[in-house]
Design a protein with these regions (language model features):
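Short, small-residue-biased leader/transition segments that mark boundaries at the very start
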Residues: 3-8
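Conserved beta-strand/loop scaffold segments within soluble protein domains that form the structured core
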Residues: 11-191
Length: 191
């Protein structure tokens, strides 16, 4: 049992903050220092999970949310993930910061879907970062249904030959909402 705990701890240690560094910016430094929720998923090599894992975060009182999702998908594995952020407090003015790190190892495929719904008084950032190794794929599907002012940064680093990333974004603007999107796919060369 102790050996298993050490294995899990080492896996988290190797994955957490491997794509988004705390020293990257003031936004990430604040995110890591105020982190109050999150999820870690490690899919082993050669595992196919057809049924999507759905992660729902519901805010039913005024609060700051600094949530972090870390997903590692092993070699030749396939995984589907859906995250849903819902805030039922229309007068909630507390800031939020959501960070997702996704790593697709050789031959892995990840379908990552995200639905956010934050009320109009909130302000926040959503950073989604991915790494793809040889012959791997990350499909990002983002539905930004927020009334809040949100900065979205979606960056995927293509590290391996034959790997790819796709991004689809749907958003609805309402009232005086300001939504900013920065999307990058960075090809780092053959490996």
């Amino acid at each position: 049992r102790r050996q298993r705990q050490m294995c899990i701890r080492d896996s988290i240690k190797d994955s957490f903050m491997s794509v988004v560094d705390y020293a990257e910016s003031k936004v990430t430094a604040v995110h890591y220092s105020l982190l109050n929720a999150g999820l870690f998923i490690n899919v082993k090599d050669n595992v196919f999970i057809e049924e999507p894992l759905q992660y729902i975060v519901i805010s039913d009182k005024e609060q700051c949310l600094f949530n972090h999702v870390t997903i590692q998908v092993g070699k030749n594995s396939k995984f589907n993930f859906i995250e849903n952020y819902v805030n039922n407090q229309k007068e909630d003015k507390a800031p939020f910061s959501l960070v997702s790190e996704v790593v697709a190892h050789e031959g892995a495929q990840i379908n990552y879907s995200s639905i956010t719904n934050q009320p109009g008084e909130k302000r926040g950032t959503i950073l989604r970062r991915g790494l793809t190794y040889r012959d791997s794929l990350i499909n990002w599907n983002v539905a930004a249904m927020d009334e809040a002012d949100v900065y979205h940064d979606n960056t995927t680093n293509i590290l391996g030959d034959g790997s790819e990333a796709n991004l689809k974004i749907v958003t609805l603007g309402v009232k005086e909402q300001k939504t900013y999107f920065n999307s990058e796919v960075v090809n780092q060369g053959l490996s």
